[in-house]
Swiss-Prot record:
<feature type="binding site">
    <location>
        <position position="163"/>
    </location>
    <ligand>
        <name>substrate</name>
    </ligand>
</feature>
<dbReference type="InterPro" id="IPR002817">
    <property type="entry name" value="ThiC/BzaA/B"/>
</dbReference>
<keyword id="KW-0408">Iron</keyword>
<feature type="binding site">
    <location>
        <position position="124"/>
    </location>
    <ligand>
        <name>substrate</name>
    </ligand>
</feature>
<comment type="function">
    <text>Catalyzes the synthesis of the hydroxymethylpyrimidine phosphate (HMP-P) moiety of thiamine from aminoimidazole ribotide (AIR) in a radical S-adenosyl-L-methionine (SAM)-dependent reaction.</text>
</comment>
<feature type="binding site">
    <location>
        <position position="269"/>
    </location>
    <ligand>
        <name>Zn(2+)</name>
    </ligand>
</feature>
<dbReference type="InterPro" id="IPR038521">
    <property type="entry name" value="ThiC/Bza_core_dom"/>
</dbReference>
<keyword id="KW-0411">Iron-sulfur</keyword>
<feature type="binding site">
    <location>
        <position position="333"/>
    </location>
    <ligand>
        <name>Zn(2+)</name>
    </ligand>
</feature>
<feature type="binding site">
    <location>
        <position position="66"/>
    </location>
    <ligand>
        <name>substrate</name>
    </ligand>
</feature>
<keyword id="KW-0479">Metal-binding</keyword>
<keyword id="KW-0949">S-adenosyl-L-methionine</keyword>
<dbReference type="GO" id="GO:0016830">
    <property type="term" value="F:carbon-carbon lyase activity"/>
</dbReference>
<feature type="binding site">
    <location>
        <position position="407"/>
    </location>
    <ligand>
        <name>[4Fe-4S] cluster</name>
    </ligand>
</feature>
<protein>
    <recommendedName>
        <fullName>Phosphomethylpyrimidine synthase</fullName>
        <ecNumber>4.1.99.17</ecNumber>
    </recommendedName>
</protein>
<keyword id="KW-0784">Thiamine biosynthesis</keyword>
<dbReference type="GO" id="GO:0009228">
    <property type="term" value="P:thiamine biosynthetic process"/>
</dbReference>
Length: 426
């Protein structure tokens, strides 16, 4: 029985109890949201050691960190370190997007290195295996695609991105609807190219019921991928993006009827003023399915700083209903991220998520309240304890010391110290 089926029956599962306690919410409130499909729980039945995580409308906004090898750089130890660093700095989930090396062993190593839910994009493996054989990606058979999906499910991944909305119909529209950037989703492009080459329907769309059967067996959350997300600001909100979105909405409803948990992925690159409307449209089109966004990135001309451009968009998206933020690192659009890039990306995304969470959860606001108290007292030890990045706190304090009880920015001119001293004197 899946979490969705249990919730529909009125059952509060052990995973729901665990999550409700961690989130500080009523288990029954969580159950009702799961039953409606508004919240999903990541916990593959074969992933025994994972601490389940929920994403949806009654829990905190969550953050995902993407890691993984590439065909140019295969360093498994580095990827495991990235996973550990991401979790240390607050990532709620990890996606292994490896495309180089022994993908099966890499995936398993990452899964055993951390205790958070793991997501993948199975078609990456199907494509990589074609290249490893000296074949073109479009030579993938339907069995190759399905075998990759089932392998990931059996290995215990908790959610998978499946670009089921890249249909033959929408691919035909691509010939007419011109984009500035084109198609930037790797998995979506693999399927679009395959459709164009063979003239066949996307197997995941055509045989969606079979996909639901597989997902149901392992209680894997299907993350319905946005293969036609905008890859640049000029393409935001175009016909292709919206057509795919409505297809995903229909597939969400079919999954719920089958007892399978689903969430929907979203953009992408979006001008800042369009973000609220895009999120609200997505929520309506998908009947309030949990919405998982990459950014959105709000400007395209700051490569090297896209952890910041995405955090800005992520905060606005979350405030307007996005439930799950995929981090972006400073290396986005430039190359494979380093461990330090991962750390910076997670922190930026966590800032965006926390900025929204503190408006909804008293416990989250209390953290900021306590920091304000500590700052008002110039209590540096307490500020250190409350800091989300203690290493950075210490680094700056040591680099820029002062002999005063304030910081080296103001020293004896510190506004807080001056007014506190005067108030104490009466």
């Amino acid at each position: 029985m899946t979490q969705l089926e249990a919730a529909k029956r009125g059952e509060i599962t052990e995973e729901m109890k665990f999550i409700a306690e961690r989130e500080g919410i009523d288990p029954e409130k969580l159950r009702r949201s799961v039953a409606k499909g508004y919240t999903v729980i990541f916990r593959n039945v074969r992933h025994d050691w994972v601490k389940p995580v929920a994403v949806g409308n009654v829990v905190r906004v969550k953050v995902n960190a993407n890691i993984g090898t590439s065909r140019d750089i295969v360093n498994v130890k580095a990827e495991i370190e990235k996973a550990k660093v991401a979790v240390k700095y607050g990532a709620d989930t990890i996606m292994d997007l490896s495309t180089g090396g022994d993908l099966d062993s890499i995936r398993k190593a990452i899964m055993h290195a951390v205790d958070v839910p793991i997501g993948t994009v199975p078609i990456y493996q199907a494509a990589e295996e074609m290249l490893a054989k000296g074949k073109a990606i479009i030579e993938m058979s339907e069995d190759d695609m399905w075998n990759a999906v089932e392998k990931h499910f059996k290995d215990g991944v908790d959610y998978t991105t499946i670009h089921v909305g890249v249909t033959k119909e929408v691919v035909e529209k691509m010939k007419r609807v011109k984009r500035v950037v084109g198609m930037v989703s790797r998995g979506g492009t693999f399927l679009a190219a395959w459709i164009l080459h063979w003239g066949e329907e996307n197997p995941f769309y055509r045989d969606y019921d079979y996909l639901l059967e597989l997902a149901k067996e392992y209680d894997v959350v299907l993350s319905l991928g946005d293969g036609l997300r905008p890859g640049g600001l000029p393409d935001a909100g175009d016909e292709l993006q919206i057509a795919e979105l409505y297809t995903l909405g229909r597939l969400v409803r079919r999954a719920r009827e089958a007892g399978v948990q689903t969430m929907v992925e979203g953009p992408g690159h979006v001008p800042i003023d369009q973000i609220p409307a895009q999120i609200k449209l997505a929520k309506v089109a998908t009947d309030n399915a949990p919405f998982y966004v990459l950014g959105p990135i709000v400007t395209d001309i700051f490569p090297g700083y896209d952890h910041i451009t995405s955090a800005i968009g992520g905060a606005i998206a979350a405030l307007n209903g996005a439930d799950f933020l995929c981090y972006v690192t400073p290396a986005e659009h430039l190359g494979l991220p380093t461990v330090e890039h991962v750390r910076e990306g997670v922190i930026a995304a966590k800032i965006a998520a926390h900025a929204v969470n503190l408006t909804r959860f008293e416990a989250d606001f209390k953290k900021d309240y306590l920091m304000s108290l500590a700052r008002g007292k110039l209590d540096w030890a307490r500020q250190f304890e409350l800091s989300q990045d203690r290493e950075k706190f210490i680094e700056i304090r040591k680099e820029r010391p002062t002999k005063t009880e304030a910081c080296s920015m103001c020293g004896d001119l510190c506004a807080i110290k001056l007014i506190n001293d005067m108030l104490r004197k009466g």
